UniProtKB/Swiss-Prot annotation:
The keyword Nucleotidyltransferase does not apply. Residues 148-220 are annotated as: Interaction with host TNIP2. Keywords: Host cytoplasm, Host-virus interaction, Inhibition of host innate immune response by virus, Inhibition of host interferon signaling pathway by virus, Inhibition of host IRF3 by virus, Inhibition of host RLR pathway by virus, Inhibition of host STAT2 by virus, Inhibition of host TBK1 by virus, Inhibition of host TLR pathway by virus, Interferon antiviral system evasion, Viral immunoevasion. Interacts with host TBK1; this interaction antagonizes TBK1 phosphorylation and inhibits TBK1-IRF3 interaction. Interacts with host STAT2; this interaction blocks the nuclear translocation and activation of host STAT2. Interacts with host TNIP2. GO terms for biological process: symbiont-mediated suppression of host cytoplasmic pattern recognition receptor signaling pathway via inhibition of IRF3 activity; symbiont-mediated suppression of host cytoplasmic pattern recognition receptor signaling pathway via inhibition of TBK1 activity; symbiont-mediated suppression of host JAK-STAT cascade via inhibition of STAT2 activity; symbiont-mediated suppression of host toll-like receptor signaling pathway; symbiont-mediated suppression of host type I interferon-mediated signaling pathway. Plays a role in the inhibition of host RLR-induced interferon-beta activation by inhibiting the phosphorylation of TANK-binding kinase 1/TBK1, thereby blocking IRF3 activation and preventing the establishment of an antiviral state. Also blocks IFN-triggered nuclear translocation and activation of host STAT2. Coiled coil: none annotated. The record marks V21, L23 as: Essential for suppression of TBK1/IRF3-mediated IFN response. This is Non-structural protein NS-S. The lineage of its organism: Viruses, Riboviria, Orthornavirae, Negarnaviricota, Polyploviricotina.
Length: 299
């Protein structure tokens, strides 16, 4: 079953015949001219995945699906949003140009909204109707007028996914189904690229489980270093002598109060040794030498 728009249905019969997109949490049920909507039971869901199936989910979560592990909010994301929640006037002219997407005009609306909703956990204004959720989708679709609001929601998800693909980011990081957070992260990525950097996205979502080696704990890394899969180690050291090194101003994961257990399944042993003093002391303690075979011993 392919996903396409129905041929010009009448408005009067739309509520009866047209598919419905549910906007959660309990915000609206919206008619759409798209056909091929499905109720997907898979919790790990992305817009790109649905497009490959030539279908689309019939439920979109404005603040992220609590059952989708790709929408789980890492503490690192909260700190990242805190860093980029300033006013538009705090950015340079070049950075303002990077903030033109998606509305066409420089704006920090999504950055500040993501900070409010995800870092400060304050979503009551939208959930109670004091702030209209439609404004977010109008900005994503650049003010395009729609006969059916469900089309506006689906087109917004598609527009986010297309931006993600153009920027070369994985759909496990930008799912296309978490509109406010997705746009905010794409804007942060655009701001970093002005400085020749890119988000070290493995730190922010469960997408880093796909990568066994995670040597860089900086929130951003040099773009040219990211081309090689094994080049994350010592990103910051390559240009450490540069007095204008943008990495000097970036956040570092070690500032977060996370237990060592958080990293055990995500970092190789040498990385844990590098960043944990107690483990390093235990590892280098000569008392363990007797447990290792001598170099001269025969097998």
């Amino acid at each position: 079953m392919s996903l396409s728009k129905a041929s010009q249905p009448s408005v009067k019969s739309a509520c009866v015949r047209l598919p419905i997109v549910v906007l959660e949490p309990n915000l609206a049920e919206l008619s759409t001219s798209y056909v091929g909507l499905v109720s997907c039971k898979c919790s790990v869901l992305t817009c790109s995945m649905m497009r490959k199936m030539k279908a689309f989910t019939n439920t979109v979560w404005l603040f992220g699906n609590p059952n989708n592990p790709l929408h789980a909010l890492e503490p690192a994301v909260e700190q990242l949003l805190d860093e980029y929640s300033g006013d538009l006037g705090s950015y340079s002219q070049q950075e303002k140009s990077a903030l033109r997407w998606p509305s066409g005009k420089p704006s920090v609306h999504f950055l500040q909204a993501a900070h409010l909703f995800f870092s400060l956990k304050n979503t009551w204004a939208v959930e109670t109707g004091q702030e209209n959720w439609r404004g977010f989708f109008h900005r994503i679709t650049s003010g395009k007028k729609y006969k059916f609001e469900g089309d506006m929601v689906i087109d917004s998800c598609y527009k986010i996914d297309e931006r993600r693909r153009r920027m070369g980011l994985p759909d496990t990081f930008i799912t296309g189904l978490n509109p406010i957070m997705d746009v905010a992260l794409l804007q942060i990525e655009s701001l970093l690229r002005v400085r020749g950097l890119t988000l070290n996205y493995h730190l922010f979502t469960s997408s880093f489980l796909d990568k066994p080696l995670l040597d860089s704990l900086y929130f951003a890394i040099w773009r040219d270093k990211k081309k090689d899969d094994g080049s994350y180690s010592q990103d910051e050291g390559a240009r450490q002598d540069d007095p204008l090194n943008p990495l000097d101003e970036l956040l570092y994961l070690s500032d977060l109060p996370k237990p060592l257990a958080h990293y055990l399944n995500k970092c190789p042993l040498h990385n844990i040794i590098m960043h944990d003093e107690e483990v390093r002391e235990a590892y280098l303690n000569p008392i363990w030498g007797k447990d290792w075979p001598a170099l001269s011993s025969s097998p």
